[in-house]
């Protein structure tokens, strides 16, 4: 996906992309210790092509059980 395509993702498309990504990790025996929302963050963040806060805000605005402070704390060690 291009950065522009990522910016235009809907919530439904993000969930589908997340599910494809997790399936690929499992098929390739890749274990990642990130929460669901952290994995979604990595998809939206797109290696820094998109804003850190934009990605976090988008996820937490779409998912009511997303805790912004907890997500930021989880990501702090990586960014």
Regions found by a protein language model. Give the residues of each.
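Acidic, low-complexity, intrinsically disordered interaction modules
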Residues: 22-79
